[in-house]
Amino acid sequence: MAGRRVNVNVGVLGHIDSGKTALARALSTTASTAAFDKQPQSRERGITLDLGFSCFVVPLPGAEPGSSDTLLQVTLVDCPGHASLIRTIIGGAQIIDLMMLVIDVTKGMQTQSAECLVIGQIACQKLVVVLNKIDLLAEGKRQAAIDKMTKKMQKTLENTKFRGAPIIPVAAKPGGPEAPETEAPQGISELIELLKSQISIPTRDPSGPFLMSVDHCFSIKGQGTVMTGTILSGTISLGDSVEIPALKVVKKVKSMQMFHTPVTSAMQGDRLGICVTQFDPKLLERGLVCAPESLHTVHAALISVEKIPYFRGPLQTKAKFHITVGHETVMGRTLFFSPAPDSFDLEPVLDSFDLSREYLFQEQYLCKDSMPTATEGDDEADPKAGHAPGGHCPRQQWALVEFEKPVTCPRLCLVIGSRLDADIHTNTCRLAFHGVLLQGLEDKNYIESFLPALRVYKLKHKHGLVERVMDDYSVIGRSLFKKETNIQLFVGLKVQLSTGEQGIIDSAFGQSGKFKIHIPGGLSPESKKILTPTLKKRSRAGRGETTKPEEGTERPEPIQPVTLNLSFKRYVFDTQKRMVQTP
């Protein structure tokens, strides 16, 4: 290798049978370990079953002619297009600098190509659209068909971050997969030039702990076990120790190679093979390798959440999703929450979680398309329905995700929630949300040790009526509690009267759910007038005479109903189920 090669990773994504592997083969000059459908199962079925890697080398754009560091190594990551293998695509997208979306020009956007576009928006900054199989278009109408599909793709990309992305026509394998190799691919030289113009040399950071995403593991007789993958962070040198966290095993690096060339060190972004001894390759097909004790294994996590707009249906608390985190996809149960309503407009914090703040429990993720229209007599939306008061959306939302089995992952890693159990043949997006893992809960007993410190609350509202006045500072209330309710639990809580006074629940009154309310500031004359009813009793002369109700007779209702409102917070993870009111 003359000078150091600068490595960039280009993802080749698209719908099944769009010609991704043929395109990667046409572009490549050097085949990596797993490239070009080497898996027998994959060759038999004609689809890419796992991440295939290959590369080609071109002069570094802008480099001085003849300089020792003039080579740009473009590593192609051929992701499978088969719908049931979307887990693998998600794992691959996390190591991609630029994405090539391969479209069958005769079919246009299909279900998996749309999902790949969604993943690209989450995990990638740049896109090139490749219209493949142009050789299948009738020669006389070819350019018109290419122009028509180009316009369609431009319209598709209009509302994405990839608006204005370049679109190029090619024929990676003229005549189809069974055709002889005699006919040369079309448009590949132009595609390489386009990629060179689009690739910006990523800034690689050698600092931080070593972390590598491993996609294949195999043994070489007399050498040891080789793990191939892409370095996500940090650096590695010969003789360093690495941990395979899923197995809790630490091994020493015996040798390293980049595309069959021995190297002594490698850094973030490099495609690498690491050789270790006395390790069974069957124990690790895909996963993570890291500096010892640099990753954490978590049973639950606090994550930031952003809904994917193409996902139909709500994101509901207590729902289960397939959660892709690190290199694993596991089932997880979600609980959504947002800032307190007065903090909805605060600037989002993307790299940490503040346990000192209070958060509002949501029955579902809040988004504008889930906002209800106001109903008559309902001033505020029902928090249970997962809608914000007044239709106002918070700028940031979070979720507690509880995993069905522990996962090993880096801190602040990408998280994607999806519904991979949905019918793969329907034309719907199965990717539901994405976010960042802000805090992992490593303690198996996190429910007792951590969750009580997470101040997520529900707002509770109870409504009742004032039955009558006892004196200037006391009234009797009813219809707030059931007969069997232990009113003692509510003693000391404040209630608001519709006449404006504030009262405090003092004690139970009888056995029927009624209660006594103390009014510290006393009742106003207007309130007393409303609450003190009068009866008319006929005198002997037949004239109406006002009297007070006699003791023992049924008490009449106040002149007009006076309502009581009891509002309090109940913290979701408070084991004592306390009711809290703000001063």
Curated annotation (Swiss-Prot):
Q: Where is this region: G1?
A: 14-21
Specify where the region named G2 lies, as residue ranges. Answer: 46-50
Which residue stretches belong to region G5? Answer: 171-173
The record's region (G3) falls at: 78-81
Q: Which residues form the tr-type G domain?
A: 5-203
Judged by the first EC level, this protein's enzyme class is hydrolase
Q: Name one Pfam family in it.
A: GTP_EFTU_D2
Q: Where is this region: G4?
A: 132-135
InterPro entries annotated for this entry? eEFSec_C, eEFSec_III, EF-Tu_GTPase, EFTu-like_2, P-loop_NTPase, T_Tr_GTP-bd_dom, Transl_B-barrel_sf
Motif Nuclear localization signal per record, residues: 534-540
| Region entry Disordered, spans | 371-390, 528-562
Q: Does the keyword Glycoprotein apply?
A: no
An annotated GO BP: selenocysteine incorporation
Q: What does this protein do?
A: Translation factor required for the incorporation of the rare amino acid selenocysteine encoded by UGA codons. Replaces the eRF1-eRF3-GTP ternary complex for the insertion of selenocysteine directed by the UGA codon. Insertion of selenocysteine at UGA codons is mediated by SECISBP2 and EEFSEC: SECISBP2 (1) specifically binds the SECIS sequence once the 80S ribosome encounters an in-frame UGA codon and (2) contacts the RPS27A/eS31 of the 40S ribosome before ribosome stalling.
* Annotated protein name in UniProt: Selenocysteine-specific elongation factor
The organism named in the record is Mus musculus
